[in-house]
A protein has these predicted regions:
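Glycine-rich ATP-binding loop(s) of histidine-kinase-like ATPases
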Residues: 137-141
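Short amphipathic helical patch at the helix-1/turn junction of helix-turn-helix
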Residues: 132, 166-167
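Conserved catalytic-core motifs of GNAT/GCN5-like acyltransferases
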Residues: 113, 162-165, 177, 182-199
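Helix-turn-helix
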Residues: 172
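Acetyl-CoA-dependent GNAT
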Residues: 3-9, 13-23, 29, 38-44, ...
């Protein structure tokens, strides 16, 4: 299933302290040809491409070409993706097939929350940028990536896992709702000069 999330406007986010994370959980799905584990810096280029291609396919029609180009250059350049991967507050996960090819990605982000998310902000973590290569849709990869992030967040003691999803992406929102997430509010999402609305969803872990 094609799913995508986008980061919320940083001006709305609540910054909370980041604590050191325990050893990463690795997820191998029994009976599946997909393995989910933390991404390698050597995979930054393919992760940047999957992110840019999926974002363009999902959201590109809704903004001008200039705004899209600006956003992609700021967010999905290989340099910026690599910087994210080296940020101790961010853990990037990759889904790989048996050949080792990266087919999807997702991020666990520590130290940010939204005011509408219930509970203590210091116990919140964010699920960010769930993207699956278009040729790999329909294989349950999105759900497997979400499950891996949820498992890691629980292992680190987080109590709420929140995310944002574009208001005009009902397919992605249905997936999250089916997996137990609930809508708690809305935030602005800025692409270049275009301001759009994302729904804030969260799940108790």
């Amino acid at each position: 299933m094609a799913t995508a999330t986008a980061i919320s406007d940083a001006s709305n986010a609540v910054v909370v302290p980041v604590v050191p994370a325990p050893e990463l959980v690795q997820a191998t799905i029994p009976g599946s040809d997909i393995t989910v584990g933390h991404a390698l810096t050597s995979e930054a280029a393919i992760i940047a491409k999957i992110g840019a291609d999926t974002f363009t396919a999902t959201f590109g029609f809704s903004v001008s070409a200039e705004d899209l180009d600006m956003f992609l250059a700021e967010t999905y350049s290989e340099t910026n993706v690599l910087a994210d991967m080296q940020d101790p507050a961010v853990q990037t996960w990759a889904a790989r097939d048996t050949s080792g090819k990266v087919l999807g990605l997702v991020q666990l982000v520590r130290g940010l929350s939204e005011p509408c998310v219930p509970g203590d902000p210091t116990t919140h973590a964010e699920l960010r940028r769930l993207y699956v290569e278009t040729t790999a849709h329909g294989r349950g990869i999105g759900s497997k990536l979400i499950a891996a992030v949820e498992e890691q967040a629980r292992a680190e003691g987080f109590k709420q896992l929140w995310l944002t999803v574009w208001e005009h992406n009902p397919k992605a929102e249905r997936l999250y709702l089916r997996l137990g997430y609930r809508k708690y509010g809305d935030v602005d999402f800025i692409t270049g000069t275009c301001v759009q609305t994302d729904h804030v969803l969260s799940k108790a872990l």
